[in-house]
Amino acid sequence: MSGNTFGKAFRVTTWGESHGPAVGAVVDGCPPGIPLTEEAIQVMMDRRKPGSSAASTTRKEEDLVHILSGVFEGLTTGTPISLMIKNKDAKSSSYDQFKNLFRPGHGDLSYQRKYGIRDYKGGGRASARETAGRVAAGAVAGLLLERVGIKTFAYTLELGSVRAKNIDPEAVSKNPFACPDMEAAEKMEARVNEVRKDGDSLGGIVQVQAAGVPAGLGEPVFDKLDAQIAKAMMSIGAVKGVEIGAGFEAARLTGSVNNDPILEDGFETNNAGGTLSGVSSGQDIVVRVAVKPIPSISVPQQTIGLDGKADTIQVGGRHDISAIPRVNVVCEAMLNLVLADFVLRQAQVRALELFAKQ
């Protein structure tokens, strides 16, 4: 299986399965001299770990990250950084009933038909557990970005058709749904409780942004900044759509409205979402991500078995009601990885200038 590595200059490979002994990531290309501790990474990991919100699974994982290599006396050495998170609360026996059945909405059927074999205990690499490695690596990337003045953050814009109307960044940390609108957060909680009684699940929208991004990040044509952001977000299992800036709303605007007027001190608007022709403009990067409902639900569903015959399935078990808000930090981590990669690639573009100044 290929496709487990992301990035060119700042490269991340994730590894491990949901019900294996551990999951993790290897970060290759991180510059030396960046202060890095397990505690610094853990801050981001704690936002993703199970049981962190009313909509999350009852599976209890500490998600403690262990740095195995690439750090000496608290500083990165420039060599590969290996990160490991042990799985401690996997209950594989609960998946035995799915050995010969395909779960709707999961990768069971497509993996079986691609590889002729699948990990039916938790979904293997298709499990959301894989994202723990992404978040750990994204935390490392975030520390690199801090050195150049870039800050990323994410919040719940919408959950179960309840949308935040008032955006107060300080409210995000004050409610279990990471919503910037406290009134909307209360409605989200009511909606989650309602759907939980039905054994169903919810989707929503995450907004992730980056401030302090300098102009010049991104490459022409196939490696555009917005193209790589879209790829990064769409690589998250629960994500079904991405828009940047005005996004799909831009299709309804005239050019005179959609264009961002250029002023002496910047731009008047940000419909472009911080990118022009695939290169950062110096404005904030603004991304919205559509997250599908969790496919593991207690509602009876039609399916087929390995023998191809019709059957009925009820998944149940310890599953999230919604991937939100745990997926928020995953989106933030992926934006970190994209930006860290382009920061290092831009340094290569201007390398002659840097050496000439020495």
UniProtKB/Swiss-Prot annotation:
Biological process according to GO: amino acid biosynthetic process; aromatic amino acid family biosynthetic process; chorismate biosynthetic process
EC number: 4.2.3.5
Binding site for FMN: R125, A126, S127, S277, K292, P293, I294, P295, S296, R318
Keyword NADP tagged: yes
CDD domains assigned to the protein according to its UniProt record, in alphabetical order: Chorismate_synthase
Metabolic or biological pathway, per its Swiss-Prot or TrEMBL entry: Metabolic intermediate biosynthesis; chorismate biosynthesis; chorismate from D-erythrose 4-phosphate and phosphoenolpyruvate: step 7/7
Cofactor dependency: FMNH2
Keywords: Amino-acid biosynthesis, Aromatic amino acid biosynthesis, FAD, Flavoprotein, FMN, Lyase, NADP
HAMAP family: Chorismate_synth (MF_00300)
Membership in a protein family: Belongs to the chorismate synthase family.
Protein name: Chorismate synthase
Organism: Desulfatibacillum aliphaticivorans
